[in-house]
Amino acid sequence: MIDQRLLRENPNLISEGLKSRGMDVDLGPLQKFCKDLKELEEKRNSLQAQGNSIGKEVGQKIKQGLPHDSEEISNLRVKGNQIKKQVGIIEEEEKSISNKLNEQILCLPNLPEKNSLEGKNEKDNKELRRWGEPISGNTLKEHWEIANQLNLWDSERSSVIAKSRFVTLFKHAAKLERSLINFMLDLHIKKGYLEVLPPALVNTASLTGSGQLPKFAEESFRCADDDLWLTPTAEVPITSLHRGEIIPRDLLPLRYVAYSPCFRREAGSYGRDTRGLIRLHQFNKVELYWFSTPERSEDALEQITSDAESVLQELELPYRVIQLCTGDLGFSAKKTYDLEVWLPGANTFREISSCSNCGDFQARRSSIRTKDNNKKNILLHTLNGSGLAIGRTMAAILENGQQSDGSINLPKALIPYFGSNKLKPE
């Protein structure tokens, strides 16, 4: 959430940041709300000071021997009660305006960091580096073709069970999915991450705190009879793991890794990636998440990105790192690196991880703080990154490992988990 103080003191900075995202927002109504709140606060403080003064005066007169039921005392108490009523009215007005202000601020995205890569859309993103040698060839198949030949999954029966964009994995694919999850968790735990297994259902406050609500309500699955939603990513419950807390500075950074099923409605993606594992309503993902001090969050983004890259390197999958421009940033992010894995069957790079520094955006929405060196409460910075999306990783393994005899060579790092170095036709 954008800092209200910034809205009052430097609205031009907000306007410029939003414009760099391609948004032209009239901040006038928001500034009016801030001005009204400031005036009401001053008025309330003045009235409360008067009320306190009257209370002291009543106490002094009673000490001097004036009877409790004297006319003078009664008049003072009447005046004091009138002030209390006025204060109550002002507080209700403040609450109403504050709610309206928050409703609008919650719909504004994070501001890009200073000196960001300017751009309108993904065409303006910048490739930073590559790893591995992409293979190519006219006879290479896409992962869904390979899966059908090896009988790895069934999407048709899954649409009977649920609807389209669901898949049921069988035998080797189910085992490979499980192997990838355990491999990724173990790799990150060795790097010092603390494993957590969060709930797959989250409440509205959790989705609001991480930035999914209210903007993206249509993108998530909601339970009909409860204030619960299926989580779109483990980022949501991990953000709320410390909601409303003050985390001791000596515990920072907190680094979590979590496996979770993820659920997304994929509204607006009709007709795109209808086959295979690229765009499903339900998929598994291993998520990396940091709670960092503000001064270390830039370095933390480089580290979390490196940790996500290490998974691809261990799995021998070629990839590239892309810095997103301001117009392509996610809602909660102020800076993002995407990792795109090479899919030779499709002859393209596809996003497999997105690593973002959210600054204090989520921490402000979720009230997550620490103390600075002067013992003053300050907001933390949060960072997240996929480490990795399991289905897309499996797709990359199938396409990059395909052999002329129809078998699939598996990465050496998976052999201890899968128990074999190949997938073979049966």
Swiss-Prot record:
One annotated GO biological process: seryl-tRNA aminoacylation
Residue positions binding ATP: R264, R265, E266, E351, I352, S353, S354
Major place of residence: cytoplasm
Enzyme Commission number: 6.1.1.11
Keyword list, A-Z: Aminoacyl-tRNA synthetase, ATP-binding, Cytoplasm, Ligase, Nucleotide-binding, Protein biosynthesis
Pfam family, one: tRNA-synt_2b
Any one cellular-component term (Gene Ontology): cytoplasm
GO MF annotations in UniProt: ATP binding; serine-tRNA ligase activity
Matching InterPro entries: aa-tRNA-synt_IIb, aa-tRNA-synth_II, aa-tRNA-synth_II/BPL/LPL, Ser-tRNA-ligase_type_1, Ser-tRNA-synth_1_N, SerRS_1_N_sf, SerRS_core, tRNA-bd_arm
Superkingdom: Bacteria
Binding site for L-serine: T233, A234, E235, E287, S386
Gene3D superfamilies associated with the record: Bira Bifunctional Protein, Domain 2, Serine-tRNA synthetase, tRNA binding domain
Cellular location(s): Cytoplasm
Domains as described in the record: Consists of two distinct domains, a catalytic core and a N-terminal extension that is involved in tRNA binding.
Chain's role: Catalyzes the attachment of serine to tRNA(Ser). Is also able to aminoacylate tRNA(Sec) with serine, to form the misacylated tRNA L-seryl-tRNA(Sec), which will be further converted into selenocysteinyl-tRNA(Sec).
Family annotation (NCBIfam families): serS
Protein name: Serine--tRNA ligase
